[in-house]
Amino acid sequence: MSALFCDATHELDAIGLRCPEPVMMVRKKVRLMAQGETLLVSADDPSTTRDIPSFCRFMDHTLVASETEQAPYRYLIRKGQ
């Protein structure tokens, strides 16, 4: 796992969940975070490889890093405004 992922402020385990649950959980968790904090998401649903980057763009958050070559997938999100 990349060193970037080790410094996450918050973590969310979405392994075993299927669309749309992972993105719904990310949205709920990010709402409780302060601007600039980071969230490490672990998921194994292939749809997250499309849905989480789209969520970040739509909600003006930054997808700092991702590992999507094989499950479990990992995403590091920095909360925007």
Curated annotation (Swiss-Prot):
Domain of life per record: Bacteria
Pfam families registered for this protein in UniProt: TusA
Keyword tags: Cytoplasm
Any single Gene Ontology cellular-component annotation: cytoplasm
GO molecular function, one term: sulfur carrier activity
InterPro entries: Sulphur_carrier_TusA, TusA-like, TusA-like_sf
SUPFAM superfamilies: SirA-like
Compartment list: Cytoplasm
Residue positions of the active site: 19
GO BP term (any one): tRNA wobble position uridine thiolation
Entry annotated with the keyword Cytoplasm: yes
Keyword Cytoplasm recorded: yes
Function: Sulfur carrier protein which probably makes part of a sulfur-relay system.
Family designation: Belongs to the sulfur carrier protein TusA family.
Name by which UniProt lists this protein: Sulfur carrier protein TusA
Organism for this UniProt entry: Aeromonas salmonicida (strain A449)
Gene that encodes the chain: tusA
